[in-house]
């Protein structure tokens, strides 16, 4: 169904988008560290909540994109465009339902999640969350629009918008934080502005009728329960999976915070590098959902199997290249980061162990899941990922830390166990062909 050129045009921009966004995010984080310890703590606390909420919007966008892809694959373009409208309606409604309580009840919400924190930190967090919450509808709409363009095989546009948005965010930080001295409010305003502009651009471009998916009129959108239900059947399990994954990371983070500054600094560096090393492969996974979704919609099940295998292999190669490169230059990376000698030594040791294992087991533990979700096998993916995450990563990590008094290596032993078990489960599910038996549209 796809030529090599079509796959290149789809996948390369997706890979660049993920890598560039990760790089820009790191730069953004470094800039925010200049506004004081109370402000840094506030941003860190609120961002952990922000990531959880943004994952909900990303899951909704995934659900809508899979429905649209399957309709396009079955040559039902009108229904695909109708599904896009319902996706926009759904994310707008859900984002407003989330935004309003986050603004009105932000103090009790932050107290409930993070307990008692210093007054200065809480005041900064309240200001930051108020402005950040205003951006939720815009990031939700952008995610929906970006997913639809990728489904239409136009992944260059979301890449360009994401890159421009990140540049705008950094320039906004310079202006609001350093020129106007607005502190955390400046950081939040910069994020809000960049998200508003990104959403407006993508909504305007979605009105072009030349593309596979477009919206003729936003004012004419009315809810259709049947289509919204189809989107939610994929979006809700995916959202639970993403949410549990993020929540598990927070539990692990709180465990690491008891290990001392040397271990915390080393763990933070390795975690950042580990996340960066797989961004390009995640881009391939996002492309896989479009490709496999269309194949399943066209009832080309052998093609769906073929592309799941071939794109997983490609992602494996890309992951190995990124991991090997980071392992090769890890000493220089820790030096550029200005890490203290003990933290750098621990980070280098951990990186070599973790990345050697990651090159083998990370890809089969994640990439087949994109193909399964595209076929509608979202409940299996949710259950497998959630159980594996909590049993291996969380329980094993806490057990090793509290029983054997292990340092950050405990986190990566748990993660390695998660990758290994999930790899075998996903591969067994893929071989069984049960993932192709779901009816999505």
Model regions: which residues?
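Short runs within selected transmembrane alpha-helices of multi-pass transporters and secretion channels
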Residues: 61, 131-150, 158-166, 187-202, ...
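Helix-terminus/linker motif at the lipid-water interface of multi-pass membrane proteins
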Residues: 23-41, 110-119, 175-184, 243-276, ...
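N-terminal transmembrane alpha-helices
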Residues: 2-30, 34-35, 51-63, 67, ...
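Small-residue hotspots at the loop-to-helix junctions and early N-terminal turns
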Residues: 37-48, 125, 129, 188, ...
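Small-residue-rich hydrophobic transmembrane alpha-helices
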Residues: 40-100, 139-158, 264-330, 361-385
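Transmembrane helical elements of multi-pass membrane transporters/channels
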Residues: 9-28, 131, 165, 194-198, ...
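Short alpha-helical transmembrane segments in multi-pass integral membrane proteins
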Residues: 1-14, 68-135, 179-236, 292-358, ...
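Transmembrane alpha-helix boundary and packing residues in multipass membrane permease domains
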Residues: 14, 18, 29-30, 66, ...
């Amino acid at each position: 169904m796809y030529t090599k050129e079509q796959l290149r045009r789809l996948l390369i921009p997706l890979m660049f988008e993920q890598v560039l966004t990760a790089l820009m995010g790191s730069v953004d984080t470094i800039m925010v560290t200049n506004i004081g310890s109370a402000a840094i703590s506030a941003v860190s606390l609120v961002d952990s909540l922000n990531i959880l909420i943004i994952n909900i919007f990303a899951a909704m966008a995934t659900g809508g994109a899979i429905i649209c892809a399957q309709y396009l694959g079955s040559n039902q373009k009108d229904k695909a465009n109708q599904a896009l409208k319902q996706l926009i309606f759904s994310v707008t409604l859900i984002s407003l339902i989330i935004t309003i309580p986050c603004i009105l009840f932000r103090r009790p919400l932050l107290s409930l999640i993070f307990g008692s924190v210093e007054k200065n930190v809480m005041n900064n967090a309240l200001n930051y969350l108020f402005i950040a919450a205003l951006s939720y509808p815009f990031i939700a709409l952008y995610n929906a629009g970006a997913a639809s363009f990728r489904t239409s095989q136009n992944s260059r546009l979301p890449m360009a918008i994401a890159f421009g948005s990140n540049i705008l965010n950094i320039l906004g930080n310079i202006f609001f934080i350093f020129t106007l001295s607005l502190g955390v409010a400046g950081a939040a305003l910069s994020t809000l502005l960049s998200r508003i502009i990104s959403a407006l651009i993508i909504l305007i471009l979605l009105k072009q009728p030349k593309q596979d998916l477009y919206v003729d009129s936003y004012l004419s959108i009315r809810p259709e329960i049947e289509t919204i239900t189809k989107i939610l059947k994929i979006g809700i399990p995916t959202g639970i999976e993403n949410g549990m994954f993020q929540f598990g990371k927070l539990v692990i983070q709180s465990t690491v915070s008891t290990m001392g500054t040397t271990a915390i600094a080393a763990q933070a560096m390795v975690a950042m590098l580990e996340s960066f090393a797989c961004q390009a492969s995640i881009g391939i996974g996002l492309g896989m959902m479009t490709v496999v979704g269309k194949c399943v919609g066209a009832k080309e099940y052998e093609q769906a199997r073929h592309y799941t295998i071939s794109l997983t292999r490609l992602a494996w190669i890309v992951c190995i290249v990124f991991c090997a490169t980071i392992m090769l230059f890890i000493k220089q990376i820790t030096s550029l980061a200005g890490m203290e000698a003990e933290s750098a030594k621990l980070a280098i040791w951990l990186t070599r162990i973790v990345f050697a294992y990651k090159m083998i087991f990370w890809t089969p533990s994640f990439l087949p899941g994109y193909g399964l979700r595209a076929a509608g096998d979202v409940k299996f993916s949710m259950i497998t990922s959630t159980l594996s995450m909590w049993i291996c990563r969380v329980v094993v990590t806490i057990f090793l830390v509290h029983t054997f008094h292990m340092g950050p290596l405990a986190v990566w032993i748990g993660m390695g166990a998660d990758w290994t078990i999930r790899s075998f489960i996903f591969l067994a599910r893929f071989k069984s062909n049960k993932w192709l038996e779901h009816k999505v549209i």
